[in-house]
């Protein structure tokens, strides 16, 4: 009897996990989804999110919190705020976006920003060097783009590599 109950519980958990995997992605609609010109947006964190959403890279809508994005502990890198998004164009990528208050910088923020400016990386709390960091042209925003499908062997032929470069270019284009 115990084995049957355990089996039923396992099957129930498996069904619940599978049901959450293929759900539809809700994307931005209306004006925020149609205007792709960086000039149409203000220099704010929310407008950066709306701009990247208009290009179809992320989904920042509040009703999707926990599904398409997660609030991050931005203070760990000295940032004002940050979110990690599941990229909308591939299942293998996440895009983290952080805002720094340049008028009220702190030692942690200064260290992270200067390291990213120097070589696109910094050392995390464990002393490991972390790459794939990109600073906006105005130095106020930081993006971390991580795609597990891109390797040194596939980067010349991988469609995701090309898409990553497109996202980086659009990010840097915002409020030059």
Where does each model-flagged region fall?
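Positively charged n-region of N-terminal signal peptides that target proteins for export
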Residues: 1-4
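Hydrophobic helical h-region of N-terminal Sec-dependent signal peptides
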Residues: 6-14
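C-terminal motif of bacterial Sec signal peptides marking the signal peptidase cleavage site
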Residues: 16-20
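N-terminal "mature-domain start" segment
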Residues: 22-81, 153-176
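Short, surface-exposed beta-strand/loop micro-motifs that present aromatic residues
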Residues: 79-89, 129-137
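A short acidic-to-branched-hydrophobic micro-motif
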Residues: 87-108
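Short, Gly/Ser/Thr-enriched beta-strand-loop segments that form substrate-interacting elements
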Residues: 108-128
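A short, solvent-exposed beta-edge/loop patch
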Residues: 121-176
